[in-house]
Protein backbone atom coordinates (compact mmCIF):
# COMPACT_ATOMS: atom_id res chain seq x y z
CA UNK A 1 0.00 0.00 0.00
CA UNK A 2 1.16 3.50 -0.81
CA UNK A 3 2.03 5.56 2.27
CA UNK A 4 3.00 9.02 1.04
CA UNK A 5 -0.21 10.55 -0.28
CA UNK A 6 -2.65 13.29 0.69
CA UNK A 7 -5.87 11.68 -0.49
CA UNK A 8 -7.12 8.76 -2.50
CA UNK A 9 -10.18 7.69 -4.40
CA UNK A 10 -11.63 6.21 -7.52
CA UNK A 11 -10.26 7.83 -10.67
CA UNK A 12 -12.86 5.83 -12.59
CA UNK A 13 -15.25 2.98 -11.83
CA UNK A 14 -16.18 0.17 -14.18
CA UNK A 15 -19.59 -0.56 -15.67
CA UNK A 16 -21.12 2.85 -14.97
CA UNK A 17 -22.54 5.05 -17.72
CA UNK A 18 -20.50 8.25 -17.88
CA UNK A 19 -21.96 11.60 -18.89
CA UNK A 20 -20.15 11.36 -22.26
CA UNK A 21 -22.12 8.20 -23.10
CA UNK A 22 -19.21 5.83 -22.54
CA UNK A 23 -18.95 2.92 -20.12
CA UNK A 24 -15.52 1.81 -18.88
CA UNK A 25 -15.17 -1.97 -18.81
CA UNK A 26 -13.07 -4.01 -16.36
CA UNK A 27 -9.32 -3.84 -17.05
CA UNK A 28 -9.71 -1.18 -19.77
CA UNK A 29 -6.82 0.68 -18.12
CA UNK A 30 -4.97 -2.38 -16.79
CA UNK A 31 -1.76 -1.28 -18.54
CA UNK A 32 -1.75 1.85 -16.33
CA UNK A 33 -1.47 -0.15 -13.10
CA UNK A 34 1.46 1.31 -11.13
CA UNK A 35 1.81 4.32 -13.43
CA UNK A 36 2.12 7.84 -12.01
CA UNK A 37 0.29 10.58 -13.93
CA UNK A 38 -0.17 14.32 -13.34
CA UNK A 39 -2.91 15.45 -10.96
CA UNK A 40 -4.60 18.43 -12.60
CA UNK A 41 -7.24 21.03 -11.78
CA UNK A 42 -10.43 20.44 -13.81
CA UNK A 43 -8.64 18.94 -16.87
CA UNK A 44 -6.84 22.24 -17.51
CA UNK A 45 -3.56 20.61 -18.55
CA UNK A 46 -2.48 23.42 -20.88
CA UNK A 47 -0.75 25.46 -18.12
CA UNK A 48 1.95 24.16 -15.75
CA UNK A 49 0.35 26.02 -12.82
CA UNK A 50 -2.72 23.79 -13.14
CA UNK A 51 -0.70 20.69 -12.29
CA UNK A 52 -1.47 20.16 -8.61
CA UNK A 53 0.68 17.09 -8.00
CA UNK A 54 0.58 13.48 -9.14
CA UNK A 55 -1.54 10.35 -8.88
CA UNK A 56 -0.33 6.77 -8.61
CA UNK A 57 -2.81 4.49 -10.38
CA UNK A 58 -3.89 1.07 -9.18
CA UNK A 59 -6.03 -1.16 -11.39
CA UNK A 60 -8.64 -2.99 -9.28
CA UNK A 61 -11.61 -5.23 -10.03
CA UNK A 62 -14.01 -2.28 -9.63
CA UNK A 63 -12.00 0.31 -11.59
CA UNK A 64 -8.87 2.42 -11.27
CA UNK A 65 -7.96 3.73 -7.83
CA UNK A 66 -5.66 6.75 -7.40
CA UNK A 67 -3.29 7.67 -4.57
CA UNK A 68 -2.81 11.42 -4.92
CA UNK A 69 -0.05 13.69 -3.66
CA UNK A 70 -0.45 17.47 -3.84
CA UNK A 71 2.48 19.80 -4.47
CA UNK A 72 3.48 22.46 -1.95
CA UNK A 73 2.34 25.27 -4.27
CA UNK A 74 -0.42 27.81 -3.66
CA UNK A 75 -2.83 25.89 -5.90
CA UNK A 76 -1.82 22.61 -4.28
CA UNK A 77 -2.40 24.02 -0.79
CA UNK A 78 -5.75 25.52 -1.78
CA UNK A 79 -6.86 22.25 -3.34
CA UNK A 80 -5.80 20.35 -0.21
CA UNK A 81 -7.99 22.63 1.93
CA UNK A 82 -10.96 22.30 -0.44
CA UNK A 83 -10.70 18.51 -0.31
CA UNK A 84 -10.09 18.41 3.45
CA UNK A 85 -13.25 20.42 4.08
CA UNK A 86 -15.35 18.39 1.63
CA UNK A 87 -15.90 21.28 -0.78
CA UNK A 88 -14.63 19.14 -3.66
CA UNK A 89 -14.96 15.36 -3.76
CA UNK A 90 -15.01 14.34 -7.43
CA UNK A 91 -12.27 12.93 -9.65
CA UNK A 92 -12.11 12.45 -13.40
CA UNK A 93 -9.66 11.07 -15.94
CA UNK A 94 -8.35 12.21 -19.29
CA UNK A 95 -7.45 9.20 -21.43
CA UNK A 96 -6.47 8.62 -25.02
CA UNK A 97 -5.60 5.70 -27.31
CA UNK A 98 -9.13 4.49 -26.60
CA UNK A 99 -10.40 1.25 -28.09
CA UNK A 100 -14.16 0.94 -27.96
CA UNK A 101 -16.90 -1.49 -28.87
CA UNK A 102 -19.81 0.85 -29.35
CA UNK A 103 -19.89 3.02 -26.24
CA UNK A 104 -17.91 0.53 -24.17
CA UNK A 105 -14.25 1.38 -23.52
CA UNK A 106 -12.15 -1.80 -23.59
CA UNK A 107 -8.68 -0.23 -23.59
CA UNK A 108 -7.02 3.14 -23.19
CA UNK A 109 -4.21 5.08 -21.55
CA UNK A 110 -4.88 7.44 -18.66
CA UNK A 111 -2.87 10.63 -19.17
CA UNK A 112 -4.04 12.61 -16.12
CA UNK A 113 -6.37 12.51 -13.15
CA UNK A 114 -8.27 15.70 -12.39
CA UNK A 115 -9.83 17.11 -9.28
CA UNK A 116 -13.18 18.36 -10.58
CA UNK A 117 -16.38 19.96 -9.35
CA UNK A 118 -18.45 17.22 -11.00
CA UNK A 119 -17.08 14.12 -12.67
CA UNK A 120 -18.28 12.34 -15.80
CA UNK A 121 -18.18 8.95 -14.04
CA UNK A 122 -20.65 8.78 -11.14
CA UNK A 123 -18.36 6.43 -9.20
CA UNK A 124 -15.22 8.59 -9.43
CA UNK A 125 -14.80 10.28 -6.08
CA UNK A 126 -12.38 10.94 -3.23
CA UNK A 127 -12.98 8.47 -0.42
CA UNK A 128 -10.02 9.04 1.89
CA UNK A 129 -8.20 12.17 3.04
CA UNK A 130 -5.01 11.93 5.08
CA UNK A 131 -4.50 14.70 7.64
CA UNK A 132 -0.78 15.31 8.19
CA UNK A 133 0.09 17.22 11.35
CA UNK A 134 2.84 17.54 13.93
CA UNK A 135 0.79 16.38 16.92
CA UNK A 136 -0.25 12.89 15.85
CA UNK A 137 0.15 10.18 13.28
CA UNK A 138 -1.74 10.37 10.02
CA UNK A 139 -5.46 9.89 10.36
CA UNK A 140 -7.96 8.90 7.72
CA UNK A 141 -11.10 10.94 7.24
CA UNK A 142 -13.62 9.07 5.13
Where are these regions (language model features)?
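N-terminal "first-domain core" detector
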Residues: 2-34
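Intrinsic-disorder/low-complexity loop/linker signature
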Residues: 21-22, 34, 46, 62, ...
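Short, surface-exposed beta-strand-loop junctions and turns on beta-sheet-rich folds
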Residues: 24-25, 46, 72-74
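Short conserved beta-strand and strand-loop elements enriched in small hydrophobics
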Residues: 35-47, 91
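Polyanion/phosphate-binding surface patch
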Residues: 45, 52-55
Amino acid sequence: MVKDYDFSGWATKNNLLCSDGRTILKDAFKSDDGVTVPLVWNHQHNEPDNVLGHALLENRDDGVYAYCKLNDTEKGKTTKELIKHGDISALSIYANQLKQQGGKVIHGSIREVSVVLAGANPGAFIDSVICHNDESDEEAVI
